[in-house]
Amino acid sequence: MALIRVLASLLILQLSYAVTPFDRIIGGFECNEYEHRSLVHLYNSSGFFCSGTLLNHEWVLTAAHCNRDDIQIKLGVHNVSVNYEDEQIRVPKEKLCCHSTNNCTQLGQDIMLIRLNSSVNYSEHIAPLSLPSNRPSMGSVCRVMGWGLLTSPEVTFPKVPHCVDINILHIQVCQAAYPSMSENYLLCAGVLEGGKDSCKGDSGGPLICNREIQGIVSWGGFPCAQLLEPGVYTKVFDYIDWIEGIIAGNTSVTCPSDNF
């Protein structure tokens, strides 16, 4: 079912501290300590629940369904049980979603910008990721990363983020797996044979192609990494005008039409 990952994530969130909307990366490997400098750790009093991507000194990009009332953003994290000298913590100064009501709980356009309460200092473990300059090419090998589950449906969470390389697939592959989904503003990515995927806990994190963020982990099938059930990602390129407008201070900028 198209929304089953999100629903399962919400259920797990009630049961476990590290439970976020998606499991950990399936079929991947430990990320190098210095290759995820833009990856941020979103948590609250209940624990870790999502990831996000640092775009510049004061803006983070994540999924709208990662919205919470008491978000804290930790930057410069690798091993969650270790405190790093350059680790920094921020809270939202402002949260912006595509919906005219700023209702970040809708799943229609799963994208959210967080303006941080103070500027972030770049460091050995902290650096921004570039927005896409072009649309991703079909078949491109891209990397998704996060602290989500390593196994599914069994619950095994990592202390360090994991990475996995997957392919950009034709949107019809995901539409065949999830008949109710729209093709608007979404990317389909994974491997057709299964075994590699993002999952609960990876929500909001980046799908990186050629050192640019092309996707935001959104939803997919559950259990994760099944045959012919790729992941679904928010297509960042379709929101470039909105993202750049908001960051530039243009409060009148609008998202692509949400008429699906």
From Swiss-Prot:
Additional facts recorded: Negative results: does not hydrolyze casein. Does not clot fibrinogen or act on factor X, prothrombin and plasminogen. Does not have hemorrhagic activity.
Family: Belongs to the peptidase S1 family. Snake venom subfamily.
Record-given protein name: Alpha- and beta-fibrinogenase OhS1
Compartment(s) of residence: Secreted
Species the sequence originates in: Ophiophagus hannah
Job description of the protein: Snake venom serine protease that possesses potent fibrinogenolytic (on both alpha- (FGA) and beta-chains (FGB)) and amidolytic activities. Selectively cleaves Arg-|-Xaa or Lys-|-Xaa bonds.
Annotated Peptidase S1 domain residues: 25-248
Family matches, as Pfam families: Trypsin
